[in-house]
Amino acid sequence: MLTLTRICTVSYEVRSTFLFISVLEFAVGFLTNAFIFLVNFWDVVKRQPLSNSDCVLLCLSISRLFLHGLLFLSAIQLTHFQKLSEPLNHSYHAIIMLWMIANQANLWLATCLSLLYCSKLIRSSHTFLICLASWVSRKICQMLLGIILCSCICTVLCVWCYFSRPHFTVTTVLFTNNNTRLNWQIKDLNLFYSFLFCYLWSVPPFLLFLVSSGMLTVSLGRHMRTMKVYTRDFRDPSLEAHIKALKSLVSFFCFFVISSCAAFISVPLLILWRDKIGVMVCVGIMAACPSGHAAILISGNAKLRRAVTTILLWAQSSLKVRADHKADSRTLC
């Protein structure tokens, strides 16, 4: 079915503003995730053992560095190279497909983190849950390798779904008054099918994430009821760990839903309506979500907080030394 599409031009001011916001989001996202990566990788360099959660955070930060890089490349494509009055170029197709795969890996890693929190914090007398928690703690490395394998399988299937369909273009110009014309790219439908397939592939990890997060919420409720009965002191390490874990998981859920909605909305904006401003807004929202969750992860992780404190103290002492040096030089003069 052919669709009448109105191609709207984007002013230089809008493109410049979007590019500035994209650079800012890329800088914040790159710095926060690179910080998580470097803190944990430094322990690997020093041959210190990494905990299971640190291993997952290390992999999660790598996947998000790729996400931010791809979204920044998408922003550059939108502002400088891709004209929506023309068919989507191959490089923009490749960026979108790579983003879908990186986003898939990001979801699997967040699910792995949720299962790990669940296995560590849930207190249960059921034998099955105890065995499952022990299995998750012991098999975390195998789970990470499985995530890499799933991402590779998703890559192959998305590429097959994209290239297995016939590629041809139908472009019919009806009239050119007010830059209105009939423009339909059958080739872009293949991108939509790949996008839909990739998100259907995301249903199993998302359900696992919801189940493990729900179990953690139930466990927190039971723990708080137990504390109300037996003690009045709410400064319990287990309670604080529950709350920090839930804060991380709930924030990821919110950011993932917002990012997924923006991604779904961007598809018809890009393929059907050719609305570049709408696509820019969606890309900006998608780039902000991983940065927000990375900041929450840093605030909820003791090792990362200590690293932030150390860096701030070092920066403060360096500024103080420079100020004292300038004051001494002025006194001598």
From Swiss-Prot:
Keywords for this protein: G-protein coupled receptor, Glycoprotein, Membrane, Receptor, Sensory transduction, Taste, Transducer, Transmembrane, Transmembrane helix
Spans traversing the lipid bilayer: 18-38, 56-76, 95-115, 143-163, 191-211, 252-272, 277-297
Cytoplasmic side: 39-55, 116-142, 212-251, 298-333
A matching Pfam family: TAS2R
Carbohydrate-modified residues: 178
Ranges facing Extracellular side: 1-17, 77-94, 164-190, 273-276
Localization per record: Membrane
Transport found in the keyword field: no
Source taxon at top rank: Eukaryota
Membrane topology: Multi-pass membrane protein
GO CC annotations, alphabetized: plasma membrane
Role, per record: Receptor that may play a role in the perception of bitterness and is gustducin-linked. May play a role in sensing the chemical composition of the gastrointestinal content. The activity of this receptor may stimulate alpha gustducin, mediate PLC-beta-2 activation and lead to the gating of TRPM5.
Something else known: Most taste cells may be activated by a limited number of bitter compounds; individual taste cells can discriminate among bitter stimuli.
Name of this chain's protein: Taste receptor type 2 member 38
Record lineage: Eukaryota, Metazoa, Chordata, Craniata, Vertebrata
Gene encoding the protein: TAS2R38
